[in-house]
């Protein structure tokens, strides 16, 4: 399935149905009064987050959504039928923004969450509505009220517990394929990964988390270099970032700083998130090289550095346990926050 994380769509709710002019006509009743009914309400445009979608690709081909008009009123004071709503289904994690791409309308971050983007127009009044003591036979009926219309942007930020960041060829896709059932494209050249990948990491029957792999960053990504930094949005919701560094590539300190600078340039609070620094591809280094590069990286970052090999699996399980600790802590904090809000 192709991946698309941004889309612009046009939405318009239904117009209200028209009221009608009608008079009661029955045998033996010479002067039947007005009995024209009101129009029905137009359909709403509703957007709902569903759990079984992970891309906005459908909106590349369908970009206009219009709800139907309400039914017109009828004689015998009958109100027109209300029009059905149009339900637009989007992946969990979709944000809806105004046409300026800056103003947030809604963040559909949990399954079943929905928002009414455009409300249908009210139906117009039939002539029975205008009957009064001074006007016994009104010949007036209103048109239905027009529906609302707007252009909006949909922006998908995937829901993952942990995110993989690093330069191209750092081994992120290999790591994801080893620790989960995901099968991303893997090759020995930069930018093999062109869009985010998700995998579920299962440590036990009770312990699992979702891991996101995003395309590699290069220097100047926040200014549009390479694939840019647009995919960093997919790790904004993560509880912890796994910063993978290619230990066999040479200057590991420069590699770490490059990605950190790009995250700072992007913003979004990424640099405030817990970061696990991982020196990957230890199978391609001598023990002396691995020790020296680990020490240099620890000195530059001021953090503990984990050494692993995504190919052989060395050091992977302790790393996953460390990630699970952060994820469990984040889930508990979120649970407490939600229980406090509901109380």
Swiss-Prot record:
GTP binds at residues 166-173, 191-195, 213-216, 280-283, 309-311. The keyword Zinc-finger does not apply. Pfam families: GTP1_OBG, MMR_HSR1. Keywords: Cytoplasm, GTP-binding, Hydrolase, Magnesium, Metal-binding, Nucleotide-binding. InterPro entries: G_OBG, GTP-bd, GTP-bd_Obg/CgtA, GTP1-OBG_CS, GTP1_OBG_dom, GTP1_OBG_dom_sf, OBG_GTPase, P-loop_NTPase. The keyword Magnesium applies. Its cofactor is Mg(2+). GO terms for biological process: ribosome biogenesis. GO terms for cellular component: cytoplasm. Its main location: cytoplasm. It is found in: Cytoplasm. Residues 160-328 form the OBG-type G domain. It comes from the Bacteria. Residues 1-159 form the Obg domain. Monomer. Belongs to the TRAFAC class OBG-HflX-like GTPase superfamily. OBG GTPase family. This is GTPase Obg.
């Amino acid at each position: 399935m192709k991946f698309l994380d941004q889309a612009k769509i046009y939405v318009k709710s239904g117009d209200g149905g028209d009221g009608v002019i009608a008079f009661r006509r029955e045998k033996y009743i010479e002067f039947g009064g007005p009995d024209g009914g009101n129009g029905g309400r137009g359909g709403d445009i509703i957007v709902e987050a569903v759990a079984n979608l992970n891309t906005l690709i459908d909106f590349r081909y369908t970009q206009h959504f219009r709800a139907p008009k309400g039914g017109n009123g009828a004689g015998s004071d009958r109100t027109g039928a209300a029009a059905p709503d149009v339900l637009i289904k989007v992946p969990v994690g979709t944000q809806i923004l105004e046409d300026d791409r800056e103003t947030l309308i809604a963040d559909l971050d949990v399954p079943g969450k929905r928002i009414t983007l455009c409300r249908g127009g009210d139906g117009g009044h039939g002539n029975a509505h205008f009957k009064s003591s001074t006007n016994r036979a009104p010949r007036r009926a209103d048109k239905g009220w027009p529906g609302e219309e707007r252009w909006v942007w949909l922006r998908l930020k995937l829901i993952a517990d942990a995110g993989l960041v690093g330069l191209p060829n750092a081994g992120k896709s290999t790591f994801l394929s080893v620790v989960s059932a995901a099968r991303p494209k893997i090759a020995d050249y930069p930018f093999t990964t062109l869009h985010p990948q998700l995998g579920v990491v299962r440590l036990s029957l009770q312990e699992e988390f979702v891991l996101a792999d995003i395309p590699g960053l290069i220097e100047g990504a926040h200014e549009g270099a390479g694939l840019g930094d647009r995919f960093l949005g997919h790790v904004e919701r993560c509880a912890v970032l796994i910063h993978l560094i290619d230990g066999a590539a040479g200057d590991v300190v420069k590699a770490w700083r490059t990605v950190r600078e790009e995250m700072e340039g992007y913003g979004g609070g990424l640099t405030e998130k817990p970061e696990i620094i991982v020196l990957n591809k230890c199978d391609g280094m001598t023990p002396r090289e691995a020790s020296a590069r680990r020490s240099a990286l620890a000195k530059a970052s001021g953090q503990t550095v984990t050494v692993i090999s995504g190919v052989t699996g060395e050091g992977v399980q302790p790393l996953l346990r460390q990630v699970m600790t952060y994820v469990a802590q984040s889930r508990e904090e979120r649970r407490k926050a939600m229980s406090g809000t509901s109380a």
